[in-house]
Amino acid sequence: MTTATFGTNQVDWEQRLDFDKLRTDRLANLKRELNKSDVGALLAFDFANIRYMSSTHIGTWAIDKAIRFALVTRNSDPIVWDFGSAAKHHKLYNPWLDTTTAEADADPHAPHHGAVKPRAESGARAGISTLRGAFNPDAGIADEVASKIKRELEKFGLLNEPLGIDIVELPILFALQRAGITVVDGQQIFLNARAIKTGEEIGLLTQAASMVDAAYEKLYEFLRPGVKENEAVGLVSKVLYDLGSEYVEGVNAISGERCSPHPHVYSDRLIRPGDPAFFDILHSYQGYRTCYYRTFAVGSASSAQHDAYKRAREYMDRAIALVRPGATTADIVAVWPKAEEF
């Protein structure tokens, strides 16, 4: 049975993807891996890890700035430090940052029902990092970041435990170390948490892929001699954004003699009759991304192209047959030809 797909809207007459469950399950996965590890807390600067942890998003313009950061500890729920305007927006529209399931994080005086309690302090806070060095070190921002993190670790009794970080700028690392915090690699904890997808995550990945299906249909109609690779990129980007993509990360549009070796970047090359043309469409829908390839023959395919397609299809079918829980990439590549054979 395939994964169901729905419209991109929410409706009152049909149960679709449950975003509350998505948020709850992701945090539960992360806390499970955190509690299995040797670290007391996780600090994230990576855009995707912040979103996975806290379900906050401020637009993909900030994806490479390393200016936002988020912390989750064994004894508390996520805290996100963000631009002041963004922090205020989170406070208004991200109510999950004001509740917790952790006793040490809860407001002991606030009434509550069940396991979810109001927090003693909001998880939506104003605060920024060094913007990849754009702020002069004399401003002392790195030490301010370290001070914020140290306060939370002290508050929750974890100052003497290692702090796992996904990525970090050196001024921040040095400031944390000066504050007496032991910093270790936290990337694998995030990766372990994200490895097994929830039902909602699979649904979002399927929805993201279905949007690329639509883009490829338009691309099939568009491809002909005389159009350029960059025009194909523009077409795909428009289709995806019109369908609700939040970020078209890239479209590899590669044709003719540019197909081998793969240059990983499109050009303004004119597509010619009989060209092979392959595409890789990378985009994000609700934070779930595609890397979805398709190859076309422009006009008609030669006998050599037919033979190459047949061989490639056989390789793919062998690999797909091995995809199951517990399989590794080593199992897959074992049935593929060695690179030297090409």
Residue ranges, per PLM feature:
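Active-site neighborhoods and metal-handling regions in enzymes and metal-associated proteins
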Residues: 1-342
